[in-house]
Amino acid sequence: MRIGIDAMGGDNAPHAVIEGVALYLKENRDDEIVIFGDKNIIEEECVQKVQPLDKLEIIDCKEKIEFEDEPVKAIRQKKDSSIVVGLQYLKEGKIDAFVSAGSTGALMAGGLLIVGRIKGIDRPALTTRLPYKDGQYLLIDVGSNTDCRPINILQFAQMATVYVSKVLGKKNPTVGLLNIGTEENKGNDLSKQSYELLKSAKNINFVGNVEARSLPFSPPDIVVCDGFVGNIVLKLTEGMGLLFFDILKDIAKSSFRAQIGGLLLKPYLKRLKGKYDYKEVGGAPLLGIDGIIVKCHGSSDGQAIFSGIHQAKAFYENNVLALLKEEITAESEV
């Protein structure tokens, strides 16, 4: 497998990206990595960190898409950027997957303009896994589509079902629609119309509406919503996790007795923190694009990049792209 990596994307690029590549190649010596970015910087980093070097190819790219760049404009104007060149390689079949911690908007715009969408998909969507009491659930969409139609919500659920069952190994995953109440008639027009489509769909295990307050305790395997709501849920979850541990730190420092208690609880709190750590999840696939694209967190370190590359590998090895095409084609013929 040949995996493309955007070396210039993310707050900690290119150092964290090269660290992630080095970790990955230590465990996956049969795969090849193609790195896109400033060759002079990348070569210096790779010589120090990456072995074996013969499994590495560097494609020199002189431009970089910044987080503040307007996505579509950047894709059209920065032709020699690591994202544009990497996606072009993906389109031409020179790599099997592309991983980036760069601009989400640019990745989505580039995926649509360069790689293209799966036939029958109205809008691709971005997913992520979020923690709850007993594990993780998949949230879709988390920011790609702030305005949606009911057909978009249905297709998000269909794509997520294939991904969760084939990559994450959850048979017949449950699907819930994020709403302001559990009753069937709750919500705005989008929610009500989406509910009817989801309820009548034969290829998903729809369990009804789900409220936000149940997400930390007993969510379905997949929670579907528009990207505006999904991004708020994502950012709030990240923020609450940080707040929780900041409060614990303050309490642990409040007295000598609290410090002793904190030391005793430290290994257990470390395990708890791991559940909220995006580094372990790695990345979020862009479902609906006609190619494997994995978006890593903008603040990714080497471990997060390593996990993101593994996400791309699992997507590829489980033939998820072909399965998504089959699913959408079958549904459109009904």
From Swiss-Prot:
Q: Which Gene3D superfamilies match?
A: Isopropylmalate Dehydrogenase
Q: Which gene encodes it?
A: plsX
Query: Record's Pfam families?
Result: FA_synthesis (PF02504)
Keywords for this entry? Answer: Cytoplasm, Lipid biosynthesis, Lipid metabolism, Phospholipid biosynthesis, Phospholipid metabolism, Transferase
> Which HAMAP family does the record associate with it?
PlsX
Q: What is the lineage of its organism?
A: Bacteria, Bacillati, Bacillota, Bacillota incertae sedis, Caldicellulosiruptorales
An annotated GO BP: fatty acid biosynthetic process
Q: Which family does it belong to?
A: Belongs to the PlsX family.
**Protein name stated in the entry:** Phosphate acyltransferase
Keyword Lipid biosynthesis attached: yes
Q: What Gene Ontology molecular-function terms does this entry list?
A: phosphate:acyl-[acyl carrier protein] acyltransferase activity
Under the heading InterPro entries, the entry gives: FA_synthesis, Phospholipid_synth_PlsX-like
Q: From which organism does this entry originate?
A: Caldicellulosiruptor bescii (strain ATCC BAA-1888 / DSM 6725 / KCTC 15123 / Z-1320) (Anaerocellum thermophilum)
Output the SUPFAM superfamilies linked to this UniProt entry. Answer: Isocitrate/Isopropylmalate dehydrogenase-like
Signal sequence region: none
Identify the pathway: Lipid metabolism; phospholipid metabolism
Establish whether keyword Zinc-finger is in the entry.
no
Localization (cell): Cytoplasm
What's this protein's function?
Answer: Catalyzes the reversible formation of acyl-phosphate (acyl-PO(4)) from acyl-[acyl-carrier-protein] (acyl-ACP). This enzyme utilizes acyl-ACP as fatty acyl donor, but not acyl-CoA.
Enzyme class, one word?
A: transferase
